[in-house]
């Protein structure tokens, strides 16, 4: 972004270009084409001729480059400075959506509603780029901020920490659950406080009713939404329909999605209604909504088995998905459950064992690109169902293929885990490869 604003930018890092992941290498090469100077593989970069410095928040004061910057008394661009720059470059209203679960889905549905209402929407979510802050900056550089009527941003906790000075017209909190705590010293309170930065940034704030106990003490004019709870926006799920009641009336829309899509659609509707979108436009959008990739997505039938890809990986989200399929015979295959955060894999095993009789767990860690079979066994060893078939595999492709060995026509093959949220394109590609191989090998 600084390069786009006609500053001369140098990126320095002790790592060589080849040390970065392939997607990061591509981004760095593109930056170089656009005029950014890459000073990589340099353990002792010079600060001569430098006016200002931006340093990664994780860089310790003891790092050699940090000491050089301090000794030279250079101006340091803080996250607050950077966030204000970004805010000044976005001339339209911003809707910001955060939460532990449901933020990607809710962002997608909200975007669909506003597009149906005729708005030219600039939408950024982890569905397109796992690092949403990168997507926002990329959009500014490409002129999207100047070529829209409204911006709708998914705001994960990392993005909120970086862009905490955005002026948000309406902020929405879907929920807060125990996840990512390893990034906050194991403290749920610190994680909650990071999420609550959105409340401070927002002119109007809406939260799931489950969060009322942490929102009410800091904001007395917040609005709340939920399924079947007494609050400002009340949703009621029916057979292929959704009813929303609020202070100005109610409406019922045909709705062809399932499971957590109901509550997320109530959240999206609450944002739209608060902003002034009509019931008619919301109804049209929700009645036509067909879901989004890898969120309770039916990817087809293979050898008489319906295959569903879901990105649920936290206890509550997984339970919602498993409850939906409780009357079906399900063969379940799972990711390695650690990404940037360490997770309780025994809790996963105990939960899934209550619902399914075949559990196949992958031991491949996509973050460090290592096979960690202990992670798969930790899930499987916690399964208390004595009749369960438990299989550990070296990667998700093998896991997907083996689902056909342990299933029969009429069964549901279900995927769950965090890797789709971490790297959707790579993970789905590996899964689809396994499904193709398994359907042929075990037909």
Model segments located where?
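ATP-dependent carboxylate-amine ligase
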Residues: 1-20, 26, 36, 53, ...
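Short, basic phosphate-binding NTP loop
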Residues: 1-96, 117, 287
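Short beta-strand "acidic-cap" motif of Rossmann-like dinucleotide-binding folds
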Residues: 8-13, 121-123, 152, 224
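Active-site regions of enzymes building and remodeling cell-envelope glycoconjugates
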Residues: 25-38, 50, 70-76, 168-172, ...
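Walker A (P-loop) phosphate-binding motif
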Residues: 83-129
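Flexible active-site lid/hinge loop adjacent to a nucleotide/diphosphate
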Residues: 140-215
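Adenine nucleotide phosphate-binding catalytic loops in nucleotide-utilizing enzymes
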Residues: 185-192, 220-319
